[in-house]
Amino acid sequence: MQPWEYVYDLLMPAGTPIGEKQFTKYIYLTLAVPATKEFEEKISKGDTKDLELPVYPVAFNTKPAEFKGDRIATKKDLLTRSGLYDDDYDFEAPIKDLEFKSALVPGYFPLAVLKLYFEGDIDAHPEDYGLKPIDGHKWYSSVNGSYKVTNGLLFNVDETKNSDHYSVLFLDENPKEFNTLNGYGVVRFYMDLKNAPPEVYTKAKEECISAGGLYYYDAREETAYCRLPLNKEANIKASEFIHQLYEMIKSKITSEDFLKNEMVYQLPGPKVIPVKPVIGKTFEEMVKTADKYLLLGETAKEETKQETKQETGKEEEEKKETKQESQEQLFNPFAIVDEMLAEGQPAEAKQENSPQQQNPPAEAKQRQQQEENNAEAPQQRQQEENTPLKMNILTEEESNKSEEGQQPLENNIQTFGFKGDIADFFASLVKDKYIFLPILSRRSPSEYKNAKKQRTFKGEAVEEHTEIPRENMKYAEFRKKYSEIVNKYAVPFMHDGIWAILPGKEQELYKELDKLVQEAQKLGISPEEIEFMVTVLLVPKDAVVREINRQIKEIRTDIDEVKQELQNPDLKKTKIASLKKQLEQKQLRLNLLKDLYSTVTKEEIDKLAGKVKDTLYTLNQIAKYAGQQEETDETTEEEEEEEEEGNDTVKLS
């Protein structure tokens, strides 16, 4: 089964309403917990130890309830097609009434409600999908069978009230944008088989399946149907959704609240016993398949991108040259060379391979300096220029060895101001045991003058220096826009005032900040002031993992405390609303940390191309930007003057 097929069988409508080009659906995602034969046999024998039951996502259509904002789902509204999990259990058996009773299994447990916007009346041609006429019988496009998703919202389910035959869903009033399935679509074709010979029936089925479609024969109408993904992106979109759904389910069934209150079995009498939830076999296999499609999709995108760049290489180089010349005196710390990030080659190597490119004098000088710094390791440098960027995953033993002889952890955390184009900085990194994380500091540009005299900040000095009561309006406007952009694409990390860019959001962030920097310079904010706000954090990989784990444990403790407080029956409505808001924010924070952790620890990181390639880098020689590795508190006045002139390093110790 392909990802697009799974998503269709799970939650997509069979067709579009007749005569409607656009329509919406409220789709209720829940967990079904069927009673397996093994489970029933154990219970019948009185064996109540180590009980397990599989959980599977299922989806229901909903209709508006009497009260505004509420939805009703009934057993007749099941969207998930019955054959989806047939290999695992009899899907129809546990589905009788849609009920949620915490002491009963099997049951249904709410995940979320999706509001999906659809566009129908898709113009599709059978020939484009590999469906050709068979002995005079043609395939035709089904008017009400093709559609695509154009937009979406995700609602949390605050509460459910249940009757014998239906469940009322009380939804969160603040839905979140849900665009994972945007662009996912299906097309349907049909062939009239009245009076057709038997071989046409056989060929129609074979042709549909060989084209990668779902075949269905309606005996009453004597018509064959073939449903196919709308385009190549359908599998990628479906794979992304399956991955998100998996994370949602995993988070649900591992929560302490779920394990204590939901997954219990009522024995005869008052006794209840815990039951361990496990991901159902079919869904677990589907997640693995989706992961493969995501990797293949990223690889295909990368190959297409490289082919396009090869065709237009000269054009791009000319544009880049023009841009460099026009911005030679205009400092822009967020400018990025897309070719380098996409192909994983240092910008320097590209310039050497391009006879048409003329380097500005300043850049040539910088290249010469870099060559001198790397003279001691020519073989290593040559090897890195000719190999794609790849993150070294250290074993625990290797990690421990790498720490021997190093300075303490807090002294390994350093920040470095960008110099010139950011691509030059990336090109100077040498792969070894460090992870490179772009970090944005929220320090005010107005600190610049004080910072020039004091180049070393300690502890939480970053936040202490940001309070400037009479800040110029141009700085205030810049800070406001800057803060909005950073909050959109980054998350606080390790120190107050230090932000780590979210995985996969680098390009979007740089583009927005690129525009903002240009606007700021037009307002008269100097390049030096802007440069002071932009830093890079270098942290050993094992330190990143340890810190993320610490924060995850901390935030989980906070979440449990808030949930416990919500159990208080004497709470006022305003307090409940405030606690729910806190819970939502903490859960979001937890999800972001998990994303960052999975990105940092992911093996074969280079295969994920655009998602993390420009987030994670490793390096060996950083003396050029670190100011000879370390500054001490015993720096003389003469050394401080030299720092002001030639070293933009800012260190957090």
Curated annotation (Swiss-Prot):
Its main location: virion. The keyword Coiled coil applies. Residues 302-329, 344-388, 626-653 are annotated as: Disordered. Keywords: Coiled coil, Virion. Residues 630-647 have a biased composition (Acidic residues). Residues 302-326 have a biased composition (Basic and acidic residues). Residues 371-381 have a biased composition (Low complexity). Residues 300-330, 505-649 form a coiled coil. One of its GO terms (cellular component) is virion component. It is found in: Virion. It comes from the Viruses. This is Structural protein ORF653. It comes from Acidianus two-tailed virus.
